């Protein structure tokens, strides 16, 4: 394997015994196969056992053997909680191989996305708002053609999202007051803030008008957007709620339609 992939040689070291056989045998391969070729090892991978403890011992063994640049990868059904705990324990891990828990979330194994009718286009080009009634207020749909705006503070941190009618423009020069669409008595006024429209047309008149970004661009954009969230929102335990509110105009339209349909 090392002879075939000398520039990308990552060896699994936990098949039998990590510290007694795995790491020593990997070092032997590095010495006897890669070194004569003038190549440096890419890394080793630990897929079982006490990864925090084993990675510290493996790091020491690799350093003493003259391979401080050899990385250590950890795998074995990792999720964000295990990764966090490994970091807190000071594990000497350079990268984490996350498989099934990234492609299928334990808490939400099925993405519950459903299309719901929001408006009907009439013959004259106008739109008639539509919504679904439900016994649960949270499950009632939001009618009309809409836009989504993100409100940022003066430091560029995201404070809340605001859903508006498609023809609305969010002005923030004099501050903006948002309220919870369910518990309407809960409101908050933001000053020294800015608003950015998140809605981007993908298709117009049946034709695609959006150029798909590269995977690298998607990754950079996602990382940048997550960086705008407060740490209190991103923490695992008891995170702060990130609010998504409705504009007054949209909330009034929804309430009027709800009263009409409930008669």
Q: Positions of the model-derived regions?
A:
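Gly/Ser/Thr/Ala-enriched C-terminal appendages of enzymes
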Residues: 60-65, 70, 78-263
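Buried, small/hydrophobic-residue-enriched core segments of structured protein domains
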Residues: 1-68, 78-82, 88, 104, ...
